[in-house]
Amino acid sequence: MDNFMLTQQQIDDICEDLDGPLNFLWGYIRDAYGIHPHQLDPASFEERKKDFLFLIGKLMDEGRLKLAKNDEFMTGSTEEQVEMFRKSFPASDEEMELGCWFFFDECPAGAVWVFKGERENGEDYYEWT
């Protein structure tokens, strides 16, 4: 599994039907690597982390994801917000605690999915997780 990276098709598949908290996105990446939910895979952790950070940046740049904490949107550029995640991200599957880290105070933000023009009046719909 060394140097495995998501293919464009896997990225497209993951990005197609996103919703739910960020641990879902982490789980989709884990699944793409063929790793079972309770399996620890230190060899691929850094690559999965890079893929996760890449995907949240991509989704933010596309306007499909905003990050928020305590009911307030995070401020700063996409790069600054991704860097905030990079700095606080766990160093291993063990520290990730089966995806529970995304619900701990140490996690800098949660997902707010943006559905463009989905409200009755044509405004964007925000799904807070």
Regions found by a protein language model. Give the residues of each.
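Generic surface-pattern signal
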Residues: 16-20, 34, 61, 87-94
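Alpha-helical DNA-recognition elements
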Residues: 58
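Generic detector of bulky aromatic hydrophobic side chains
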Residues: 24-35, 47-48, 52, 65-67, ...
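A short, conserved structural fragment
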Residues: 61-71
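Short, amphipathic alpha-helical interaction segments positioned at domain boundaries
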Residues: 74-129
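Short amphipathic alpha-helical interface segments
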Residues: 1-50, 54, 69
